[in-house]
């Protein structure tokens, strides 16, 4: 039976989401996305063209694929800005699944402004959007976002683009326990093992951009991320053994040859 990721009315068989930033061109973005097997790609609509048909348009590369464009509000610092932006995007493209991202610290950490995020989430969800909300790794905030109508919560693993990996593994577990919507670990993934760990902790998916786009070989890293997410998910579903302080022999003691 297929292991489906369901976000609102949308369903996906891949649990990896990729970003579109920091690539040299749209062609490389497309090639890496296809290699990753991802079925969603985030697009910062204030920076990447998806609405003007008279300019090079990222949508042209994906129009014949099954990859869903996921507009995000990167660059927005208030709920009002994000709400206005997404309404314009839906009017221009018809896309209603979005990544809500409202930054509180634009200089150093790029941490989210969770108060503005919750405000925007409630308005956008009531307006018919399927909202995937970028947030900190706090289970209380995650629950508030779910109550505000978020179809998925996206706690950061570490600061955006840092490549530090998951800095607080317990919080990923706490967020997962706190909500009944998918949890997508977002930001800070640096390599394939980070993605696998996120999935083994119980995350429903992983979003990564910089780790692929700025790798020495983006296509190869995209493929590595694909298999890391699959392996991590399978490991989580299989169930890990408990940790013990002492050794346990793997071979039975019965029937041993006596000397």
From Swiss-Prot:
Single GO biological process annotation from the record: thiamine diphosphate biosynthetic process
CDD domains in the cross-refs: ThiG
Enzyme class: transferase
A GO term for molecular function: thiazole synthase activity
Keywords annotated in UniProt: Cytoplasm, Schiff base, Thiamine biosynthesis, Transferase
Cysteine pairs bridged by disulfides in the record: none
Pathway recorded for this protein: Cofactor biosynthesis; thiamine diphosphate biosynthesis
Annotated localization: Cytoplasm
UniProt-listed Enzyme Commission number(s): 2.8.1.10
Xref: SUPFAM superfamilies: ThiG-like
Pfam families (UniProt xref): ThiG
Keyword Cell cycle part of the UniProt annotation: no
InterPro entries to which the protein is assigned, alphabetical: Aldolase_TIM (IPR013785), Thiazole_synthase_ThiG (IPR033983), ThiG (IPR008867)
Residues annotated as catalytic: 99
Reaction equations catalysed: [ThiS sulfur-carrier protein]-C-terminal-Gly-aminoethanethioate + 2-iminoacetate + 1-deoxy-D-xylulose 5-phosphate = [ThiS sulfur-carrier protein]-C-terminal Gly-Gly + 2-[(2R,5Z)-2-carboxy-4-methylthiazol-5(2H)-ylidene]ethyl phosphate + 2 H2O + H(+)
Binding residue positions for 1-deoxy-D-xylulose 5-phosphate: 161, 187-188, 209-210
Chief place of localization: cytoplasm
GO cellular-component term (any): cytoplasm
Family: Belongs to the ThiG family.
PANTHER family: THIAZOLE SYNTHASE
Record's function text: Catalyzes the rearrangement of 1-deoxy-D-xylulose 5-phosphate (DXP) to produce the thiazole phosphate moiety of thiamine. Sulfur is provided by the thiocarboxylate moiety of the carrier protein ThiS. In vitro, sulfur can be provided by H(2)S.
Oligomeric and partner information: Homotetramer. Forms heterodimers with either ThiH or ThiS.
Name of the protein in its database record: Thiazole synthase
Organism of provenance: Nitratiruptor sp. (strain SB155-2)
Gene from which this protein is expressed: thiG
């Amino acid at each position: 039976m297929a292991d489906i990721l369901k976000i609102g009315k949308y369903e996906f068989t891949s649990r990896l989401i990729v970003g579109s930033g920091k690539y040299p061109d749209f062609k490389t973005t497309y090639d890496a996305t296809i290699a990753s097997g991802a079925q969603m790609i985030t697009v910062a609509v204030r920076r990447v063209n998806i609405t003007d048909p008279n300019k090079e348009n990222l949508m042209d590369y994906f129009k014949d694929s099954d990859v869903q464009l996921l507009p995000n509000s990167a660059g927005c610092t208030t709920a009002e800005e994000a709400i206005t932006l997404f309404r314009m995007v839906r009017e221009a493209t018809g896309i209603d699944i979005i990544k809500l991202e409202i930054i509180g610290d634009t200089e150093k950490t790029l941490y989210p402004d969770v108060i503005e995020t919750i405000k925007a989430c409630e308005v956008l969800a009531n307006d018919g959007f399927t909202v995937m909300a970028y947030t900190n790794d706090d289970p209380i905030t995650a629950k508030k976002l779910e109550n505000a109508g978020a179809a998925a919560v996206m706690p950061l693993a570490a600061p955006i683009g840092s490549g530090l990996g998951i800095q607080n593994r317990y919080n990923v577990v706490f967020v997962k326990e706190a909500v009944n919507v998918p949890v997508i670990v977002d930001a800070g993934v640096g390599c394939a093992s980070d993605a696998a760990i996120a999935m083994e902790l119980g995350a429903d998916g992983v979003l990564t951009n910089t780790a692929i786009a700025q790798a020495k070989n983006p296509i190869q890293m995209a493929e590595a991320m694909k298999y890391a997410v699959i392996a991590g998910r399978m490991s989580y579903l299989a169930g890990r053994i408990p940790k013990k302080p002492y050794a346990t022999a793997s071979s039975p003691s019965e029937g041993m040859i006596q000397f």
